[in-house]
C-alpha cells in the first residue's frame, strides 16, 4: 500500500483552491457560519429567518447551505444586525512585515 501524502493548508481553503478572491470568500464563509449559528441557537425556521433578514426563503436556504457567492459582505453584515448583533469594523495600519493589508474576521 502506498503512503498518503498530506499537505498542510494555509488556513484559507479558498486560497488553497486558487480562488482569486479568497480573502473575501473566507470572510463571507465566516459571516454565514455566524448567521447559521444564530439561526440554529434561536431555533428559527427558514421562513422566519427570511422574514427577519428581508430575504426569500430559497435565498436563506442557499445561504445556510454555503452558497453565498452572489451575496456581498455588506449584505451579510446587515443580516447579522437584523439578527440582533452589533458589527464593528476596524481599519488599522499593516505591520511593516507585510506590504499588503488583509481582511480578517473576529467574532466576540
Region annotations inferred by a language model:
Residues 1-33, 97-108:
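N-terminal flexible/basic segments that precede or flank functional cores
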Residues 28-44:
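Short, amphipathic alpha-helical "recognition" segments used to contact nucleic acids or chromatin
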Residues 36-38, 46, 61-66:
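Conserved interaction-surface patches within small, structured recognition/assembly domains
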Residues 44-61:
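Short alpha-helical DNA-recognition segment
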Residues 52-54, 95-99:
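Glycine/charge-rich, flexible interdomain linkers and switch-proximal surface loops
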Residues 57-72, 77-78:
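Amphipathic, hydrophobic secondary-structure cores in small proteins
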Residues 74-90:
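DNA major-groove recognition helix of helix-turn-helix/homeodomain DNA-binding modules
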Amino acid at each position: 500500500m502506498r503512503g498518503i501524502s498530506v499537505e498542510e493548508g494555509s488556513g484559507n481553503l479558498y486560497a488553497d483552491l486558487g480562488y482569486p478572491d479568497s480573502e473575501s470568500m473566507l470572510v463571507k464563509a465566516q459571516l454565514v457560519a455566524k448567521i447559521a449559528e444564530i439561526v440554529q441557537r434561536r431555533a428559527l425556521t427558514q421562513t422566519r429567518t427570511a422574514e427577519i433578514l428581508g430575504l426569500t426563503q430559497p435565498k436563506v436556504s442557499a445561504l445556510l447551505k454555503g452558497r453565498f457567492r452572489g451575496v456581498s459582505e455588506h449584505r451579510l453584515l446587515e443580516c447579522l444586525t437584523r439578527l440582533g448583533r452589533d458589527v464593528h469594523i476596524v481599519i488599522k495600519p499593516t505591520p511593516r512585515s507585510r506590504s499588503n493589508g488583509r481582511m480578517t474576521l473576529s467574532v466576540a
